[in-house]
From Swiss-Prot:
Recognizes and binds the 7-methylguanosine-containing mRNA cap during an early step in the initiation of protein synthesis. GO terms for cellular component: eukaryotic translation initiation factor 4F complex. MRNA binds at residues 115-116, 169-174. It comes from the Eukaryota. One of its GO terms (biological process) is translational initiation. Belongs to the eukaryotic initiation factor 4E family. The keyword Repeat does not apply. Pfam families: IF4E (PF01652). The lineage of its organism: Eukaryota, Metazoa, Chordata, Craniata, Vertebrata. Residues 1-23 are annotated as: Disordered. It comes from Danio rerio (Zebrafish). Keywords: Initiation factor, Protein biosynthesis, RNA-binding, Translation regulation. This is Eukaryotic translation initiation factor 4E type 3. GO terms for molecular function: RNA 7-methylguanosine cap binding; translation initiation factor activity.
């Protein structure tokens, strides 16, 4: 499924505000504002997605406990159509504006981007570092590939991509593609599809890791 280009849907510029305040000390999500924006674009011509997808925002600091990670996790919005996806994407700060160690996630349904969630515990991620000047393009391309189900033919028939994340780091940013079952990762060619979509990008430190292999899987940080 190819996702149509973004419509021109932006916040009222007279408001001088955004649904998300990306200051380092307080990242606030105005869910009501996003609700108003998405409702404005939904009509009988909306193009439904194959499944709903939920945007999440969080900030992960070294030494953070599982409970703290969970409490720092903020749901932004669940999108059901191409139009609602673009209305959210266009009206939250670009990843380049997020503070250090903040992350955006887009997860299938309303599953949370936590390793130990029942729906995620058997899965894992393809993880790679991205040059900062390429992060915006990579994140957008992966989002579109994900909601367009472009990884379906590159996963094992018993598996699927269930999310994608981008995390702001000091030198290079990190992107991750989540799948539902780590035991089928060797049968997948998700990385091959990413390289096809982004042939101009020089990814670094590319690898796959099951969630259960993280040292913090049972008691420390419950996410990347």
């Amino acid at each position: 499924m190819a996702v149509p280009a973004a419509p021109n849907l932006q916040l009222n510029t007279a408001r001088q505000s955004s649904p998300v305040n990306s200051t380092e000390n307080d990242i606030h999500i105005d869910e009501r504002e996003l609700e108003n924006i998405t409702n404005h674009v939904e009509d009988g011509t909306s193009l439904p997605l194959h499944s709903p997808w939920t945007f999440w925002l969080d900030r992960s600091l070294p030494g953070t406990t599982a409970a703290e990670c969970e409490s720092n996790l903020k749901k932004i919005y669940t999108v059901h159509t191409v139009q609602s996806f673009w209305s959210v994407y266009n009206n939250i700060p670009p990843v380049s504006c997020l503070p250090l160690r903040c992350s955006y996630h887009l997860m299938r349904g309303e599953r949370r981007p936590l390793w130990e969630e029942e729906s995620n515990a058997k899965g894992g991620v393809w993880k790679m570092k991205v040059p900062k000047e390429s992060t915006l393009a990579v994140w957008k391309e992966l989002l579109l590939a994900t909601i367009g189900e472009q990884f379906t033919d590159y996963c094992a028939s018993e598996d699927e991509v269930v999310g994608v994340s981008v995390s702001v780091r000091e030198r290079e940013d990190v992107v991750q593609v989540w799948n539902g079952n780590a035991s089928f990762a060797n049968e997948a060619n998700v990385l091959g599809r990413i390289y096809e979509l982004l042939p101009q990008i020089s990814f670094k430190a590319v690898f796959y890791k099951p969630h259960e292999e993280h040292h913090a899987f049972e008691g420390g940080r419950s996410r990347h």
